[in-house]
Amino acid sequence: MSAHDLKLEEIVNPETLRRKLNELADSTDENYTSPTVRKVVLQALKDALVRGRANAEGMLMKDGGGTLCAKRLSFLMDTLIEALFEFATTKAYPMINPSKAENMAIVAVGGYGRGGLAPGSDIDLLFLLPYKQTPWGEQVVEYMLYMLWDMGLKVGHSTRNIDECIRLSREDMTIRTAILDARFLTGNRELFKTLVTRFDEEIVKDTGPEFIQAKLAERDQRHRKAGETRYLVEPNVKEGKGGQRDLHTLFWITKYFYRVKTKEELVKLGVLSRAELKLFNKAEDFLWAVRCHMHFATLKAEERLSFDIQPEIAQRLGYTAHPGQNYVERFMKHYFLVAKDVGDLTRIISAALEEQQAKHVPGFNRIFLTFSRRKRKLSADGDFVSENHRINIARPEVFKEDPVNIIRLFHLADKHGLEFHPEAMQSLTRSLKLINSDLRENPEANKLFLEILTSPRNPELILRRMNESGVLGKFIPDFGKIVAMMQFNMYHHYTVDEHLLRCIAVLSEIEHGELENEHPLSNHLITTVKRDRNLLYVALLLHDIAKGRPEDHSVAGARIARRLGPRLGLTPTETETVEWLVREHLTMSMVAQSRDLNDRKTIIDFADTVQTMERLKLLLILTVCDIKAVGPGVWNGWKGQLLRTLFYETELVLTGGFSELSRADRDHQAREALADRLSDWPKDKRDAYLALHYTNYFLTVSLEDQVRHAHFIREADRNERALATMAKPHTFEAVTEITVLAPDHPRLLSIITGACAAAGANIVDAQIFTTGDGRALDTILISREFDTDDDERRRAERVGKVIEDVLSGKAHLPDVLAKRTKPKRAAKAFKVEPRVEINNTLSNKFTVIEVEGLDRPGLLSELTGLISDLSLDIASAHITTFGEKVIDSFYVTDLVGHKISNATRQGNIRRKLLGVLSGENGSKTNGRSSQAAA
């Protein structure tokens, strides 16, 4: 990279800056260390810093060069520090006849030492001394540091002599790494040369394995902290997996082990090919560009690429929308592909290190065994060998001789439970061009792939290796299109390909009985569909494969399934089942969460879609895997209960047992089960309590929750409390349940949801029930905030207190809610087109109003309040939150119990609800609500 490319003269002119500092200092008769002189010198340095950064940002916007920007900012800092040091040693604290001890070198270390800086990066300096610190040295260091701090810079610093540097770097790996990146700035160059020579001879020499072990352990710990996967949709660009620090780690260990200074030397040594060096530089340039833009845009050292800044960074980088993908999603896909490239480079360098005697050191996520290599043939033709519990190729030409060996490598690794040898993965990466249409249509290759996908061992692990190596996306091109694809919303935590792999992992866990307690129904059903288990794995791999296209991904995905099924060896009937599962993969979740499961028509319509028990079982298991794999906290026990209820109700229809008698029988059994758990109650009290609840309560609420509710209501009655709340944290589901007992009235739901918003609680779900004596029993699920149950319970009790205060009139809802009307920071980044649908076909008795819009504090309260104002009764409400988006369904009638059939009235309802969703005039919250009996 030439000075011409950098255009450093547009950043700062070193000679002009030094001359200006001297002129400013000489323009006054005061001492050079006086406050007046210090002030003008500081201002000149600040001006140069601001001007240089502004020019660097402008050049970044123009040429897009991330590495160029980082080097320009580093040059700017070099110039400021060199000018400041010269001023400090020639003007402020000059030495006429310095002793040997009275000199120093200013050395850039750490990230700054590598010659690249982001706008908000720390400036790490080593004040290098020949011997002990002197009074003169203390004055210079102090003067420089305070000036740099007053410029608003974050400066990390150490003052050491050479002996101390050597001793400490021997003891402390962080210091050793910092000195590894040391770069001379100004001062006594001979001091710096001595340090470098001694460091290389006394520290680096013969300690390569030790250093590699430490840096890889440090990397693994960093990944655990930042998130193990490189496909988190809000990645940490600096510290996350596949981020900038991973590139730094790769260069550190190669620089240390091979004792090189530049990446280019690794090509000469055969560690990297020229293409791989180009990949390294491209990844580095992109990550620098993203990070510099983030710092410039936020005016701080922001390292997390969060939702709220992704749109601006994408615009700064020049991304535009394509059909099916907006500009943010295209930018983030590029980001994740770069993160994947970093993973590829990790494997390549790992192979080279092991080849160069690093095999006794913990490698990349596994141990290089210390005993000598023992090879064992894995295939009859001798193409593959087992080497220290890792699969390797027997010779370099294995993939070229027979491209099916590319798939066979993974099949054998799964069959024998082997890890992958770095040499095999390096050769594989360089053989991806062999995956062509002939291999894709090869029957044996597809048979092997299906066996990998449906392996009874750990299919997710092997598929992940196939994906990381690029094989999966090449072998199934439609999968390749969704690799690294993110969806710009707060609901999906991972990229699409990562989500699909996690779905496979969940299914495998269910099949192995590992999730019996959490998913009891799926755990049972999986044993009854063994004949079709392969179809589940195929459907899960394909269910989101058409994401990012202009059309409905379920419909497009079904077409892909129809095309791929025969290729994978499925029969026409099996292919049809997979196609159906992909097309309907969202249906069961949608019906369970946003429809009234106590409405007979809901069940009949769903049964008409499913048609057979076999499909019902498969769809239930697929739905559980899909929701579970979306991300932490998305699955919760209530969603499981809703899915189980829908399954059992539909089962009755499909098996011919759906009748009021069967429903009544199940109601009777549920009442008997609760009565048995309340056997210590007096019989009259027990019977009276059981009579309080309607059938839908017993068919929807789990027995354990029924018992809790019984004791809760009994305690409230004993204390003559008409109004009471109860909190229960759910640790695993990352939600907290608040149960509210209150006199029922039409505006209760609006008041409760408004009070939750006022208390800062984010509602993720709600259940609404009424009792026979005119009371409401409402259960609200809110997002968890604290790690410990005790802290979370106290917080939930505070939320419950706000609800009680508002319901009792002690607090005025509009007043307390007004303080909490700011939407979540991340939600501001999203746009959700408001939607209102009014449907009279989903229920025989009720009109179903379904609304969709951007979530905000108090929205549910506003919606239910408006519905009440429109003279509508809510029979049931079903609240579903998908990240920043809400989809709420209300089963309503007019005040005399009829559906809303008048088109003019429907239009008025739709218009006013759209106003609330858009935040327009209809969105004033005043605690209004309407009856919400499930």
UniProtKB/Swiss-Prot annotation:
<dbReference type="GO" id="GO:0008773">
    <property type="term" value="F:[protein-PII] uridylyltransferase activity"/>
</dbReference>
<keyword id="KW-0677">Repeat</keyword>
<dbReference type="InterPro" id="IPR043519">
    <property type="entry name" value="NT_sf"/>
</dbReference>
<dbReference type="GO" id="GO:0006808">
    <property type="term" value="P:regulation of nitrogen utilization"/>
</dbReference>
<comment type="function">
    <text>Modifies, by uridylylation and deuridylylation, the PII regulatory proteins (GlnB and homologs), in response to the nitrogen status of the cell that GlnD senses through the glutamine level. Under low glutamine levels, catalyzes the conversion of the PII proteins and UTP to PII-UMP and PPi, while under higher glutamine levels, GlnD hydrolyzes PII-UMP to PII and UMP (deuridylylation). Thus, controls uridylylation state and activity of the PII proteins, and plays an important role in the regulation of nitrogen assimilation and metabolism.</text>
</comment>
<feature type="domain" description="HD">
    <location>
        <begin position="496"/>
        <end position="613"/>
    </location>
</feature>
<dbReference type="Pfam" id="PF08335">
    <property type="entry name" value="GlnD_UR_UTase"/>
</dbReference>
<dbReference type="InterPro" id="IPR002912">
    <property type="entry name" value="ACT_dom"/>
</dbReference>
<feature type="domain" description="ACT 2">
    <location>
        <begin position="848"/>
        <end position="931"/>
    </location>
</feature>
<keyword id="KW-0548">Nucleotidyltransferase</keyword>
<dbReference type="GO" id="GO:0008081">
    <property type="term" value="F:phosphoric diester hydrolase activity"/>
</dbReference>
<feature type="domain" description="ACT 1">
    <location>
        <begin position="737"/>
        <end position="819"/>
    </location>
</feature>
<comment type="similarity">
    <text>Belongs to the GlnD family.</text>
</comment>
<keyword id="KW-0378">Hydrolase</keyword>
<protein>
    <recommendedName>
        <fullName>Bifunctional uridylyltransferase/uridylyl-removing enzyme</fullName>
        <ecNumber>2.7.7.59</ecNumber>
        <ecNumber>3.1.4.-</ecNumber>
    </recommendedName>
</protein>
<feature type="region of interest" description="Uridylyl-removing">
    <location>
        <begin position="380"/>
        <end position="736"/>
    </location>
</feature>
<dbReference type="InterPro" id="IPR003607">
    <property type="entry name" value="HD/PDEase_dom"/>
</dbReference>
<dbReference type="Pfam" id="PF01842">
    <property type="entry name" value="ACT"/>
</dbReference>
<keyword id="KW-0511">Multifunctional enzyme</keyword>
<dbReference type="InterPro" id="IPR002934">
    <property type="entry name" value="Polymerase_NTP_transf_dom"/>
</dbReference>
<keyword id="KW-0808">Transferase</keyword>
<dbReference type="Pfam" id="PF01909">
    <property type="entry name" value="NTP_transf_2"/>
</dbReference>
<dbReference type="InterPro" id="IPR013546">
    <property type="entry name" value="PII_UdlTrfase/GS_AdlTrfase"/>
</dbReference>
<dbReference type="InterPro" id="IPR010043">
    <property type="entry name" value="UTase/UR"/>
</dbReference>
<dbReference type="Pfam" id="PF01966">
    <property type="entry name" value="HD"/>
</dbReference>
<dbReference type="InterPro" id="IPR045865">
    <property type="entry name" value="ACT-like_dom_sf"/>
</dbReference>
<feature type="region of interest" description="Uridylyltransferase">
    <location>
        <begin position="1"/>
        <end position="379"/>
    </location>
</feature>
<dbReference type="InterPro" id="IPR006674">
    <property type="entry name" value="HD_domain"/>
</dbReference>
<keyword id="KW-0460">Magnesium</keyword>
